[in-house]
A protein has these predicted regions:
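Bacterial N-terminal signal peptides that target proteins for export
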Residues: 2-13
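N-terminal maturation segment of proteins
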Residues: 24-589
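Bacterial N-terminal signal peptides
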Residues: 11-22
């Protein structure tokens, strides 16, 4: 496929970070220095507008300020940064700074694009929303000190204002016809009502106040607990109640009936923008759709071979029905499912030295998806650490166990834990020579492409020996291939939700529950699902090129090192770096 770089404007003279025009040709060293100054300015600004990094109890905004004035000012500043970035002669930067420029520019551009397309009108997807994002807020506080509790309480006290600002933008979306579709909102109110509790002490927001980790005296500790109960009962829970009422009586009834984002104002342009953002290529939706159909046909043929291998007498649909309904393929308790996932992860741990030179220092755990979001959540997901004293976590959805087949658990675990997301993200965080905006970056085409490639690596690590598990691997690969078809189908080509679900049902062994939740995810998050297969196919193609050109000089551990050593990068940057590695290796022979 043809790859595209984010647009760059080349000039012999550049703007300084203060936008003063330079009057002379700059040396490479001074250009790198000036670029670094600019990126430092961008990073400083990001910190200034991020309320979660604030530790001052007197700060006015400890949760995001989403007023129209503030969002407009932030967008203006980002456009300013883009002008400064585009004024730099990228060819004059060091090779590493050229990558830095590409990545930070894409990050800033994405924020500008989201604002331009009014993404803030829809602060929710079928899986989560601003109301559930607060569950993670607890991580950013030091509860070994009284000040940590006080800061947390101050943040909680701002929940009503934060909710009202989001609701105001949702009302703007209702006026503009830019809402989530009604189809994906059925039952969504349960994720809101989960926070509305009569017993304050059962609230997850009260959890930090169950243990006196700051070792305060009894009077101080009891005073903090009383304050927490007051903030929750008078501010937080009423905010959730107000949102619940707005959602059920105003928002959902007014939500659009059409599921495709292309039916919304400027929707086709928005989808094309999201497709480019999530794949980091210039592939059109039409080309992506066709690629998906080709991959579906290829994978289907491999699945048919396994059906023959196990001696099943019946059609593909009958075999899938057998997998979906036979009790032998399902755990009977959450503990059993978690233990199976943990065992698979531990088996893969032992194979990692054969595949990688460097392993991350940060450990990971296996845990259930939080109950408040589990009903509409995907099968599993990786939740990265936010602080140095935390582990990463591979979340396994234990809700509706009869919809969580064991035959896909090897593929799921390798994707979310190791060698997939945990290994890649944890290693990325340890690349100390990279600036923070790259260590903390997550480019979906790279990260999800690596996750899907990691499922494939299980073949080389001795997994999928059971034919049903291998069928599970293929159904997960088919799942990602089908995404290319149904995501573009719904958002660009007028497919109905039922047609998309039928395509998924007919071509994968995913449970019907998963088919529904996944289809709704694609509807509510346009374009993101395209990244997996595009990224995986790129990594596989680069590996094949390296194996062919290097012959007996090919080293799988070195290849993986080259894939991961630059962190999360756009696919065209990855291709440039792998080609450089191949050429350098050949030159040394």
């Amino acid at each position: 496929m043809k790859n595209v770089r984010p647009s760059r404007l080349f000039s012999a003279c550049v703007f300084s970070v203060t936008l003063a025009l330079s009057g002379c040709q700059l040396t490479s060293h001074s250009l790198d220095s000036q670029f670094t100054q600019l990126t430092n300015q961008i990073e400083t600004y990001r910190g200034e507008i991020s309320p979660y990094s604030r530790k001052d109890l007197n700060a006015d905004y400890l949760l995001p300020n989403l007023s129209a004035t503030v969002l407009a000012e932030q967008n203006k500043q980002r456009v300013n940064f883009l002008a400064q970035l585009d004024s730099i002669d990228v060819s004059g930067l060091s090779s590493e700074n050229q990558i830095n420029h590409t990545i930070i520019r894409a990050q800033v551009q994405n924020k500008v694009d989201e604002y331009r397309f009014n993404a803030h009108y829809m602060p929710l997807t079928s899986e989560y929303g601003f109301h559930s994002s607060l569950s993670f807020m607890v991580r950013g506080h030091d509860f070994t000190k009284k000040a940590g509790f006080e800061l947390y309480l101050k943040r909680l006290s701002q929940v009503p204002r934060f909710f009202q600002q989001n609701i105001a933008w949702m009302k703007e979306g209702m006026k503009a016809g830019l809402t989530q579709p009604q189809a994906v909102l059925v039952g969504y109110e349960e994720s809101i009502s989960a926070y509305i509790l009569e017993n304050i002490e059962e609230s997850e927001f009260f959890a930090p106040f169950k243990a006196n980790t700051a070792k305060l005296n009894d009077a101080e500790w009891q005073a903090l607990q009383a304050q927490a109960k007051q903030v929750l009962s008078e501010s937080v829970i009423p905010a959730y109640q107000d949102y619940f009422t707005f959602f059920t009586t105003e928002y959902r009834p007014a939500a659009r009936e059409e599921i495709g984002i292309s039916t919304t104002p400027n929707g086709k342009a928005f989808y094309a923008n999201r497709a480019q953002h999530y794949t980091t290529t210039d592939m059109t939706p039409e080309a992506i759709h066709e690629l998906g159909l080709q991959e579906v046909a290829r994978i289907r043929a491999e699945m048919e071979q396994i059906i023959k291998q196990v001696g099943f007498e019946g059609s593909f649909a009958e075999f899938v029905h057998f997998l979906r309904t036979d009790p032998q393929f399902y755990a009977t308790t959450p503990e059993q499912l978690l233990k199976e996932a943990s065992f698979i992860a531990k088996k893969m741990d032992a194979q990692l030295p054969k595949l990688f030179h460097t392993l991350p220092r940060r450990p990971y755990g296996v845990a259930p998806v939080p109950a408040s979001i589990a009903p509409k959540y995907t099968t599993g997901r990786y939740s990265g650490a936010r602080k140095d004293d935390e582990a990463g976590f591979y979340w396994v959805n234990t809700y509706a166990l009869d919809k969580r087949p064991l035959y896909v658990l090897e593929a799921l675990t390798l994707h979310e834990a190791v060698p997939g997301h945990h290994l890649q993200i944890a290693l990325n965080a340890e690349l100390d020579y990279l600036p923070s905006y790259r260590r903390n970056a997550y480019i979906s085409a790279f990260g999800e492409g690596w996750g899907l490639y990691s499922e494939y690596l299980g073949l080389e690590a001795g997994f999928y020996q059971d034919p049903y598990s291998n069928f599970g691997r293929l159904t997960y690969e088919m799942w990602r291939a089908a995404r290319l078809v149904v995501d573009t189908g719904m958002h660009m080509f007028g497919w109905s939700r039922d047609r998309a679900m039928k395509f998924m049902q007919d071509n994968t062994a995913l449970s019907l529950h998963n088919v529904k939740t996944e289809t709704d995810r694609y509807i509510s998050w346009p374009g993101q699902a395209l990244s997996y297969k595009i990224g995986e196919l790129t990594i596989k193609r680069l590996r094949k090129e390296a194996e062919t050109r290097l012959g007996d000089k090919f080293d799988i551990r070195e290849f993986h090192h080259q894939i991961l050593r630059h962190g999360s990068v756009p696919l065209f940057v990855l291709e440039e770096q792998v080609n450089q590695y191949i050429n350098d290796t050949l030159a040394q022979s």
